[in-house]
From Swiss-Prot:
PROSITE patterns: COMPLEX1_49K. Its EC number is 7.1.1.-. It comes from Polaromonas naphthalenivorans (strain CJ2). NCBIfam families: NuoD, PRK06075.1. NDH-1 is composed of 14 different subunits. Subunits NuoB, C, D, E, F, and G constitute the peripheral sector of the complex. This is NADH-quinone oxidoreductase subunit D. It is found in: Cell inner membrane. It is a peripheral membrane protein.
Length: 417
């Protein structure tokens, strides 16, 4: 009788559940995975090398394009690393704005993850629900930066501009009549803070809707409970961070353990899982959305009553405002020098990490005293998570590999860099 051998299956890179350009070479015994070999590099754009030939400010928009679902969180780590080397103090109002937008970014990321993960596992309506809320969050991005995705809003020394006092309005068009437009503009009558406050008030009920659809759903539980189990010790050894580590029962969060900006003043909890499977990681991320909502509310309340500058007054690092630039020769020179030559960073090295929605996102900069980094190293959270793909999917069915990829929340912009 002929010997029955394992066969090889290529999963991706064109597969819709591959979350980008993942190529998995699966060794299968029937439908059971014996080995999973992830092939990466299909979205490699040499970001680290490009940064060596650009000034510090010119490299900032590259950060948005790493994890292109959590744009401002990438910028945050980059700015913190530069500020460490420069020794620049960030105004307190700018710190609150940064924290608020970092948490808005966390909501954007987790909503994208929840919609895509649900879709991968067969819960198609989740994507529609989640994108409904993402649309509102993108409007917040657009209000401060003019861009809905690649904002480039955080700058070394603060943020690009203060929060606007008015929101853009929808106008009557061929698709919607005046009544529909009035309904859309109902929460856009005040400032951006009013708009955010309105969203924060409604959001907990919307999260309840997601939980109604999934948390006790029998099919969802069958697809996620007991799949991709990782023990706390193994999660640490594999280099897991963020929800992947907390889902295994390890309460590690940089916002609590190594607070940066104004996180030390914020009141929030760290959701932690028990069993370390896909279902636990789902519960952790949903609970994180509720905590992010709490943080945003605290920032909104503080920003309402406290005014002040939003970027450092050191014009060798941050540009002067337009009014003074047009009337003062010295300010014009500062502006010109900053956007042609850039600022020179003192010799040294610095590592700054933030609690990115996916885990610990770190930027390591080595400076030789020039206006460009000598070396820039990006520490993406998804890289070490994807490395555990083989271990997490071994012994499971092909359909479970989709659930494992979904629970990792991987984006190839940051993995391939």
């Amino acid at each position: 009788m002929a010997e029955i051998k394992n066969y090889t299956l290529n999963f991706g890179p064109q597969h819709p559940a591959a979350h980008g350009v993942l190529r998995l070479v699966l060794e299968l015994d029937g439908e059971v995975i014996q080995r999973a070999d992830p092939h990466i590099g299909l979205l490699h754009r040499a970001t680290e090398k490009l940064a060596e030939s650009k000034t510090y400010i010119q490299s900032l928009p590259y950060m948005d394009r790493l994890d292109y679902v959590s744009m401002m969180s990438n910028e945050h780590a980059y700015c913190l690393a530069i500020e460490k080397l420069l020794g620049v103090d960030v105004p307190i109002r700018a710190q609150y704005i940064r924290v608020m937008f970092s948490e808005i970014t966390r909501l954007l990321n987790h909503l994208m993850w929840l919609g895509a993960h649900g879709l991968d596992c067969g819960a198609m309506n989740m994507l529609i629900y989640c994108f409904r809320e993402r649309e509102v969050l993108f409007d917040m991005y657009e209000a401060v930066s003019g861009a809905r995705m690649h904002a480039a809003y955080f700058r070394p020394g603060g943020v690009y501009r203060d929060l606007p006092e008015s929101m853009s309005q929808y106008k009557v068009n061929k698709i919607r009549n005046a009544k529909a437009i009035d309904a859309l503009n109902e929460n856009r009558q005040g400032s951006l803070l009013d708009f955010i406050d309105d969203f924060v008030t409604k959001f907990p009920k919307l999260v309840d809707e997601y939980e109604t659809l999934l948390t006790d759903n029998r099919i969802w539980k069958q697809r996620t409970v007991g799949v991709g189990v990782v023990s706390p010790e193994r999660a640490l050894n594999l280099g897991f961070t963020g929800p992947m580590l907390r889902g295994s029962g390890f309460a590690w969060d940089l916002r609590k353990q190594q607070p940066y900006e104004v996180y030390a003043q914020m009141d929030f909890d760290i959701p932690v899982g028990k069993t370390g499977d896909c279902y636990d990681r789902y519960l952790v991320r949903v609970a994180e959305m509720r905590q992010s909502n709490r943080i945003i509310k605290q920032c909104v309340d503080w920003l309402r009553v406290n005014s002040g500058p939003v970027i450092t007054s050191n014009h060798k690092v941050a540009p002067p405002n337009r009014e003074s630039m047009k009337s003062n020769m010295e300010e014009l020179i500062h502006h010109f020098k900053l956007f042609t030559e850039g600022f020179h960073v003192p010799e040294g090295e610095a590592y700054a990490a933030v609690e990115h929605p996916k885990g610990e996102f770190g930027i390591y900069i080595v400076s030789d005293g020039a206006n460009k980094p000598y070396r820039l190293k990006i520490r993406p959270p998804g890289f070490s998570h994807l490395a555990a793909m083989d271990e997490m999917s071994r012994g499971h069915m092909i359909a479970d590999a989709v659930a494992v990829i979904g629970t990792m929340d991987i984006v190839f912009g940051e993995i391939d860099r």
